[in-house]
């Protein structure tokens, strides 16, 4: 009897996770609000008291976070552009993504990580651009230092990523820290993985000073890489995400399949398998793939066979304006003609049942 009971206790926290209704990060809705601090803070639904406090105290930081939402959602959509679930957002939903993130899936893990990374990136960039009263360039990067190439002087404006990480942790994690359930711990883990991903690509840039461009003196600073690098890295982590269950005391994770390694702080973790996203499903938050463009010659996730879930596809002939007959003219211009190009566009058929058309 002990073994079955032990199994029940191991899975009980996961069952409780599935029944947890409030898992969305309502601060994501900040991209749809604007204006003065009080107006914005009081009109974002679902913020906890700590988040509202930070919102009122740092209106300039909140504006940076709000602008950053558009950037990280665009990056999410870029990474999922060839998949059945394409990180589509719902403008009228305060959770931004609807019910799809109620499931503790790989997709949820990625969204929490990329959103947390986006906050770090947006705040750090705003610091360096002098847009925030509470921070500026990294104050620790002063004086002389050494690297593999020799001695250099810290100069310019080093990105103050430590401030960005500190504020992001305080603001983004506030709601999850109030929760004691397994999903909150999952979100906190993936939030941290996202923050660490941005810092991973902090790079040292230098400028040489000397006669004829020689490097007699070097001035260096630390700069964040383009956010695409963070997105690409987290995408790889999404593909290698580790399914976990809560341990018996509810303080950490255990791998669901003992053949896999224990997740590190850099890995993404999830509890539930993803739906197939083939049809519109109100409960799963899936919009389905009916009408999605597919690639007839691909063998990947964007292929018509995979994207359309075996339902087949429709083909339509469309024309578009392109540049053609381009010629180089001395000096120094390339001149092209405008030409009409005809091409076939393939879109996924809808399921035969009319149920797919019901609103999400």
UniProtKB/Swiss-Prot annotation:
The keyword Glycoprotein applies. Residues 1-25 form the signal peptide. Palmitoleoylation is required for efficient binding to frizzled receptors. Depalmitoleoylation leads to Wnt signaling pathway inhibition. One of its GO terms (molecular function) is cytokine activity. Pfam families: wnt. CDD domains: Wnt_Wnt2. Glycans are attached at residue 295. GO terms for biological process: atrial cardiac muscle tissue morphogenesis; canonical Wnt signaling pathway; cardiac epithelial to mesenchymal transition; cardiac muscle cell proliferation; cell fate commitment; cell proliferation in midbrain; cell-cell signaling; cellular response to transforming growth factor beta stimulus. PROSITE patterns: WNT1 (PS00246). InterPro entries: Wnt, Wnt2, Wnt_C, Wnt_CS. The keyword Lipoprotein applies. It is found in: Secreted, Extracellular space, Extracellular matrix; Secreted. Keywords: Developmental protein, Disulfide bond, Extracellular matrix, Glycoprotein, Lipoprotein, Secreted, Signal, Wnt signaling pathway. SMART domains: WNT1. A lipid is attached at residue 212 (O-palmitoleoyl serine). GO terms for cellular component: cytoplasm; extracellular space. Disulfide bonds join 76-87, 127-135, 137-157, 206-220, 208-215, 278-309, 294-304, 308-348, 324-339, 326-336, 331-332. Ligand for members of the frizzled family of seven transmembrane receptors. Functions in the canonical Wnt signaling pathway that results in activation of transcription factors of the TCF/LEF family. Functions as a upstream regulator of FGF10 expression. Plays an important role in embryonic lung development. May contribute to embryonic brain development by regulating the proliferation of dopaminergic precursors and neurons. Belongs to the Wnt family. This is Protein Wnt-2. It comes from Equus caballus (Horse). The lineage of its organism: Eukaryota, Metazoa, Chordata, Craniata, Vertebrata.
